[in-house]
């Protein structure tokens, strides 16, 4: 979305800019249950909105969308993954923690240990998940600015009567996210844990 806006000069318009899109996408990863190689992605973007109110607005919009589609058996989970400064200390703490379990991690996470240990927290391998249960949480490493931003997001959601739970294990799979991240997770037994939607802030 950002590339399209730059290409067509849309950033010349007044900020914040809001847009929506639907497009076919492809995953460069091994297909899994509920995660196909090709899929359609519907999304919304808000550019030029640094306020935590913008994060809450996107989450409220997603909540309303699911409600109008009649999809109610979902749990909204939120987290903050901070800024690059926060994550530097967090990554170091994770590397120190997971190094003690290196022989028990899956092959992919052994590689992640050196490149991006945050991704180990998001691994779907059952052994890695068990090890991650006692791993350090990013919330404990947030700087003052990121902590206030997250507190404000929660206040906006509370004022909008949006139910949520904080899940410190949400890191999302894309490295450009900063501060707020969220996921809508299926609660029914057949699809428990399936992420039906999600996103987050990215301050480029």
Which residues does each PLM region occupy?
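TRNA-recognition modules of translation machinery and tRNA-sensing kinases, especially anticodon-binding
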Residues: 1-204
């Amino acid at each position: 979305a950002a590339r399209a806006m730059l290409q067509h000069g849309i950033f010349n318009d007044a900020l914040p800019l809001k847009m929506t899109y639907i497009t076919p996408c492809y995953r460069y990863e091994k297909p899994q249950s509920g995660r196909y190689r090709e899929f359609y992605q519907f999304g919304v973007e808000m550019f030029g909105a640094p306020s935590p109110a913008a994060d809450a607005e996107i989450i409220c919009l997603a909540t309303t969308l699911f409600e109008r589609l009649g999809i109610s058996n979902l749990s909204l989970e939120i987290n903050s993954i901070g800024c690059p400064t926060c994550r530097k200390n967090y990554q170091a703490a994770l590397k120190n923690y997971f190094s003690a379990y290196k022989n028990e991690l899956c092959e992919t996470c052994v590689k992640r240990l050196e490149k991006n240990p945050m991704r180990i927290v998001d691994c779907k391998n059952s052994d890695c998940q068990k090890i991650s249960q006692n791993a350090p949480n990013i919330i404990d490493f947030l700087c003052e600015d990121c902590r206030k931003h997250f507190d404000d997001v929660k206040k906006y959601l509370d004022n909008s009567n949006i139910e949520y739970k904080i899940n410190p294990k949400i890191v999302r799979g894309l490295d450009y996210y900063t501060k707020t991240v969220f996921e809508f997770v299926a609660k029914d037994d057949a699809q428990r844990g399936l992420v039906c939607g999600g996103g987050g802030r990215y301050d480029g």
